[in-house]
């Protein structure tokens, strides 16, 4: 017997189908992959029709698995970095003086190189530059100090010089011994103090840091010091509730020792996800549906019922002429099995995916197929009450097919009394005169289909996701029941099935009634499985909100189009018979199921960051109208999208909806208040708060035109000249006197250009030693240092561009104010061999551009002031402490197999 058992081939659970002329028996493509292909094909078809007369759009199907992998990678990324020493905030430029140096704030120097040059006619570039500068602030300030280098000095722990944030080593070789000793004494006083933050021992010291960067650092440190213990408890408690709903155990492996005294932990994301953030995205219903399928839908096989059911009910006679008997032995083709997959997708996503019948004029439809489909369609689908699986057209076609089947009297004649309306099923049949009108579709009550006299949507205990509290109960089956396929369904029934059996008996279809009576347990197992999949696996932040779900059916009946229109998939008549004869049996749960909450949180967090960015950018046009003359809301939308992670953009654009988003959609989304709290959002908001002062972004509107001679000092005393540390800059200490400033608006400039007097007017102002300010446009500012005469394009550069040309006998002038402005510092270096007039030229050089920024970017300081900028409090975690990012713990552990699988 053992040998016989070994030789017995493995039982094939899936049903065979014809792929061309080859009989195949594999399970075909995964239902989730197939769903993506079919939904996208339908969406692309509609979009392609819409875009026929307009621009071309790329309609390639996205790789959802790659998108999910990229989002998981995003979850692993840290928005902060752990460093031993902070960035250098101040550096010094050595001059020939022994007691004076130039101190440079490196933040402003580096910020001046970030982004592109702003122009008036490229608002998208302006928005993109602002985003880059804000992200630069966030990136520079998002650091945690850990294991800083220290030394021992007379029993005290003292910070090493590189920890202080000031670079001065290049200054030491030119200092006197007295000055070096003074600096050394100051360094020896940089004592590390022991502190206690959130019951953890830390090092506290005073260092130097630029104001915008320190704001981000301080906000990050406050986020860590707030511990977020309650947020972690809420997240873990919610995960345990979700695990109970989805039959998944929560893994505590990451959290076994995070409460130890030597551990500092950071929670960058939070659960549960605010579903409003995900569903507020414009035109996102199809993308969210695809994400729900990709992250939650299980894999499974299509199981056929016991073949003895049909053999002892439908085909027990030698000759069989009934429609059911004719179709009993048929085998589906690959296309027909694909239609079966569509049917089960529609059953798993009620209301979101609905079915319609294929219109194929070239196909000659067998009446038997239509009749059988009309009967089983009324037992497979729900049409009304609370939701629908069908379009109104398909429901009517099924009613007509059922009407034809009941009137097809192939065994014996049965009495029929027709009604007055001529509608399908408007007759009474049989000796007891069964009224068939009750099987005509009524979307208001669900009469005639599975929702008839059944509570198929229920609200009971609170669900983990607050936006989707509904429980689907096809056929009145409670999804909490455990399913044993060998015994489940025996003795169970529901109203529509009972009425169908009564009507078939009244119509003289006894064999078919016996068949359906025998199929009832198989039928109940089918819908019990579907109920479990919907209420357990598919429960997600991407599930359709209850208010949208409740509005789907009324909107469909009324022909109203809302934010979540259903996806319509086409199926063939015969596929209804094959779907009735097959049940979707889940074999493996989705691989993404346990990590789905983390993916959802990352996605919602990135959406919140994008929304905050767009809110601030939307205010720019009102703050700086001169630089955004041609700006439209679509410009800052595109700028934020371009600087967002590719994975998030791909999810938002899964159905290529970005090609169809309008300004109304966009502005409505930006102004909605919902946000998903996270560390990244906190730092982004703080970065925008720091960026509210545009001078901190190295952008300014205080740019003046003034003719000033480049200094040419006489070198009567070279030693004294070197000690003074002489330098020149076009950076103003204060704005010029207001009564000497001429404000040149675009209108004034255009008027004078039209009169041909623009240059002459400016020359007259320059000769009077006055100042010209060209509008209030923001300009990009760069900082450069020179130890020799700067190039002429910097010295002679004007704060505007003015071009003239002639065409067709007419003169044209182009004036632009938004040009790149350079703040330069010229450091004079002389030698003892220089003569008194070494720096004097016969023809003097002039500078034409002056800039005022109310920030201390560069200043000349004495040596004893080198460490005067040490005024920021830093917290560093000791080297023996562990800094642990527990964000990855926000995922569930092992998936539990269903007790009956």
UniProtKB/Swiss-Prot annotation:
Transmembrane segments: none
Location, primary (coarse class): virion
CC terms in the record's Gene Ontology section: virion component
Entries under InterPro entries matching the protein: Inner_layer_core_VP3_Orbivir, Inner_layer_core_VP3_Reovir
UniProt keyword terms in alphabetical order: Virion
Localization per record: Virion
The keyword Cell inner membrane belongs to this UniProt entry's keyword annotation: no
UniProt GO molecular function: structural molecule activity
Presence of keyword Nuclease: no
Function comment: The VP3 protein is one of the five proteins (with VP1, VP4, VP6 and VP7) which form the inner capsid of the virus.
Family as reported in the entry's similarity comment: Belongs to the orbivirus VP3 family.
Protein name according to UniProt: Core protein VP3
Annotated source species: Bluetongue virus 17 (isolate USA)
């Amino acid at each position: 017997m053992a040998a016989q058992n070994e030789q017995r081939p493995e039982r094939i659970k899936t049903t065979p189908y014809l792929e061309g002329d080859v009989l195949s028996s594999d399970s075909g493509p995964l239902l989730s992959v197939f769903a993506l292909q079919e939904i996208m094909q339908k969406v692309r078809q509609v979009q392609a029709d819409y875009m026929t007369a307009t621009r071309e759009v790329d309609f390639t199907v996205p790789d959802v698995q790659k998108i999910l992998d990229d989002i998981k990678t995003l979850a692993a990324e840290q928005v902060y970095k752990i460093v031993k020493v902070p960035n250098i905030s101040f550096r010094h430029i050595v001059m020939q003086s022994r007691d004076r140096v130039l101190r440079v704030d490196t933040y402003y120097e580096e910020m001046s190189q970030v982004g592109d040059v702003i122009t008036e006619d490229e608002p998208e570039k302006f928005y993109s530059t602002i985003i880059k500068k804000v992200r630069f602030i966030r990136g520079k300030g998002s650091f945690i100090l850990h294991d800083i280098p220290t030394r021992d000095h007379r029993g005290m722990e003292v910070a090493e010089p590189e920890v202080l944030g000031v670079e001065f080593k290049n200054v030491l070789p030119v200092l006197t011994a007295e000055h070096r000793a003074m600096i050394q004494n100051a360094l020896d006083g940089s004592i590390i103090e022991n502190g206690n933050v959130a019951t953890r021992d830390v090092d506290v010291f005073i260092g130097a840091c630029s104001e915008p960067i320190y704001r981000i650092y301080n906000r990050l440190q406050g986020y860590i010091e707030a511990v977020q213990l309650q947020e972690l408890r809420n997240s873990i408690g919610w995960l345990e509730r979700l695990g109970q709903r989805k039959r998944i155990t929560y893994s505590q492996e990451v959290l076994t020792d995070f409460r130890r005294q030597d551990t500092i932990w950071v929670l960058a994301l939070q659960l549960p996800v605010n579903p409003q953030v995900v569903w507020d995205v414009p035109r996102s219903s199809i993308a969210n549906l695809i994400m729900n399928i990709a992250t939650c839908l299980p894999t499974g096989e299509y199981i056929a019922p016991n073949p003895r059911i049909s053999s002892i009910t439908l085909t027990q006679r030698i000759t069989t002429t009934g429609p059911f008997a004719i179709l009993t032995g048929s085998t589906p083709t690959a296309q027909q099995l694909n239609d079966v997959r569509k049917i089960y997708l529609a059953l798993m996503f009620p209301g979101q995916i609905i079915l319609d019948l294929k219109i194929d004029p070239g196909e000659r439809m067998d009446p038997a197929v239509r009749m059988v489909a009309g009967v089983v369609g009324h037992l497979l689908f729900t049409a009304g009450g609370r939701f629908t699986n069908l379009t109104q057209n398909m429901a009517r076609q099924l009613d007509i097919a059922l009407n034809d089947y009941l009137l097809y009297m192939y065994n014996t004649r049965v009495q029929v009394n027709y009604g007055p309306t001529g509608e399908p099923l408007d007759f009474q049949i049989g000796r007891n005169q069964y009224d068939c009108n009750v099987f005509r579709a009524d979307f208001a009550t669900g009469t005639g289909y599975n929702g008839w006299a059944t509570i198929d949507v229920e609200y009971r205990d609170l669900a983990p996701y607050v936006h989707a509290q509904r429980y689907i109960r096809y056929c009145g089956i409670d999804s909490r029941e455990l399913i044993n396929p060998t015994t489940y369904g025996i003795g169970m029934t529901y109203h529509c099935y009972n009425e169908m059996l009564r009507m078939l008996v009244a119509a003289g279809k006894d064999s078919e009634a016996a068949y359906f009576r025998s199929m009832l347990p198989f039928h109940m197992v089918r819908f019990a499985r579907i109920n479990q999949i919907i209420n357990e696996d598919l429960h997600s932040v991407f599930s359709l909100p209850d208010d949208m779900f409740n509005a789907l059916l009324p909107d469909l009946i009324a022909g109203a189009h809302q934010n979540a229109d259903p996806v319509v998939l086409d199926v063939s008549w015969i596929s209804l018979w094959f779907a009735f004869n097959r049940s979707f049996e889940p074999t493996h749960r989705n691989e993404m199921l346990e990590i789905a909450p983390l993916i959802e949180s990352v996605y919602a967090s990135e959406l919140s960051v994008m929304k905050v960015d767009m809110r601030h950018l939307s205010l720019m046009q009102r703050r700086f109208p001169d630089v955004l003359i041609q700006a439209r809301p679509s410009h800052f939308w595109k700028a934020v999208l371009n600087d967002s992670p590719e994975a998030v953009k791909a999810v938002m654009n899964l159905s290529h909806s970005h090609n169809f988003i309008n300004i109304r959609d966009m502005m409505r989304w930006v102004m909605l208040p919902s946000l998903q709290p996270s560390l990244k959002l906190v730092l982004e908001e703080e970065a925008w708060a720091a960026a509210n002062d545009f001078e901190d972004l190295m952008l300014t509107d205080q740019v003046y035109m003034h003719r000033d001679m480049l200094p040419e000092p006489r070198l009567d005393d070279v030693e004294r000249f070197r000690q003074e540390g002489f330098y020149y800059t076009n950076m103003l200490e204060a704005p010029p006197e207001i009564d000497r400033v001429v404000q040149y608006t675009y209108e004034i400039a255009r008027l004078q250009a039209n009169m041909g007097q623009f240059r002459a007017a400016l020359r007259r102002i320059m000769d009077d030693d006055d100042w010209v300010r060209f509008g209030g446009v923001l300009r990009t500012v760069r900082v450069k240092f020179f130890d020799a005469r700067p190039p002429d394009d910097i010295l002679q550069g004007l704060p505007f561009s003015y071009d003239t040309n002639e065409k067709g006998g007419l003169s044209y002038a182009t004036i632009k104010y938004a040009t790149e402005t350079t703040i330069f510092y010229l450091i004079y270096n002389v030698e003892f061999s220089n003569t008194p007039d070494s720096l004097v030229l016969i023809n003097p050089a002039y500078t034409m551009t002056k800039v005022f920024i109310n920030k201390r970017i560069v200043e000349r300081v004495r040596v004893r002031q080198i460490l005067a900028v040490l005024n920021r409090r830093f917290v560093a975690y000791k080297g023996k402490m562990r800094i642990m990012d527990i964000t990855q713990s926000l995922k569930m552990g092992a998936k539990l197999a269903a007790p009956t699988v």
